[in-house]
Amino acid sequence: MEAALQGAEKRFTEQLAMFQISLSPEQLRQFRQFYENLIKWNEVMNLTAITEEEDVYTKHFLDSLSIVGLVGPGSFDNLSVIDVGTGAGFPGLPIAIAFPGAQVTLVDSLQKRVGFLQETVKLLGLENVQIYHSRAEDFGRIEAQREHYDIACSRAVARMNVLAEYCIPLVKKGGYFIAYKAERIKEEMAEGKKAAGILGGRVEQVISFQLPGTDYNRTLVQILKEKHTSGKYPRKAGR
């Protein structure tokens, strides 16, 4: 018989229920191990400024899974998802844990972070994750990766037009780029819409919300890939 959930885990499962996500004891164990390994590695390298247990569960894990507000919790089976500029693994690793039927690719430019991600994936026993050490602008120029994914997503700190140039080239025609942003992104959206159009995409919807049970305001921007992206994008670094 499983022990009763307490503290951050109990609140996490209650919050996820509002997204219609239910986790098995094994998945909860994986989130627990992810948290513990994140804190361990964070002592020797800068992975996150958020370290309190409940904050990690809410502002990293729950926030990463808020993508179901656009995709739907039952829609991830057999989807290919790429997380560009994943950092400490957000949103990609929570998506991989919660939706084992999805194939998740993580891309990050820093070898030390890639080392953390590799150890974490092995520790958690995740078989649906691939990790690449690459700059986003270089990865998007690899022919085998272009227009290869159903969904590209990113929580990276960059303006919408920059994220669009890194991510839209990786998305299949008919797929989506989804950006996780803070509450106020109005000033970014004009240039974001323009960039999306040049890259073959169209902003389909923008949803702003509070994470369930918190006062944490978030926005998701969903861009539909309607046309093929010109081979000149993403532009090389420094251009």
Task: Tell me the role of every PLM-derived stretch.
Residues E137, A182-K186, L211:
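Short "lid" loop at the C-terminus of a central beta-strand within the Rossmann-like core
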Residues E2-N78, I82, G115, E119-V129, ...:
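Class I SAM-dependent transferase core
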Residues F99, V171-K173:
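Helix-to-beta-strand junctions that scaffold the AdoMet/dcAdoMet cofactor pocket
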Residues A190-R239:
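SAM/dcSAM-binding transferase cores
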Residues R113-G115, I185, M189:
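Short alpha-helix immediately C-terminal to the canonical SAM-binding loop
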Residues L65-A158, A164:
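Conserved SAM/SAH cofactor-binding pocket of Class I
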Residues G174-R184:
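Conserved beta-strand signature within the Rossmann-like core of class I S-adenosyl-L-methionine
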Residues L38, I95, K181, I223:
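Residue-level signal for inorganic ion chemistry
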